[in-house]
Amino acid sequence: VNGMSRSMRAGAGLVGKAFAGKGGYEVRHPGAGEHVEAPLSKQVLVFAKGDKPFAIYPISSGKSSTPTVTGHFEFIRQEPGYNSHGMYYSFYFYGGYAVHGYESVPDYPASHGCLRTFIADQPEIYNRIFFGEDIFIW
């Protein structure tokens, strides 16, 4: 988020800024209480309470031929474990669109419309999301 690529390592200065709440991400919907944001231009999933982000994960959103829907949604359905499409611990927010783990999460839009996360991150993400929680995607 701080203009860094996924392969860069954060030095002490950047880590200190992040722990001081100055990590470089400005919450777009501070009046929404506890919620999730997905700014597709940054390819990240952000968990926030009011105007404070408390967790940020890298994602891969929908490619141009199968774009991710944008707008304001609520999480409506969950599916633990793997499904037949290789989606891991899915939490759906609109029809077949979900936040889910997947084996391939490049740093550019590559999915069929979902928000892909790393397999290792997804159980934590899945447990952070609650039914009816708002997600804002733009």
What is the meaning of each model-derived region?
Residues 2-3, 44:
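Cell-envelope/ECM-targeting effectors and their regulatory/trafficking segments
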Residues 3-35, 66-73, 77-138:
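Exported/periplasmic cell-wall-interacting domains
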Residues 21-63:
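A structural motif detector for short, solvent-exposed N-terminal "entry" segments of globular domains
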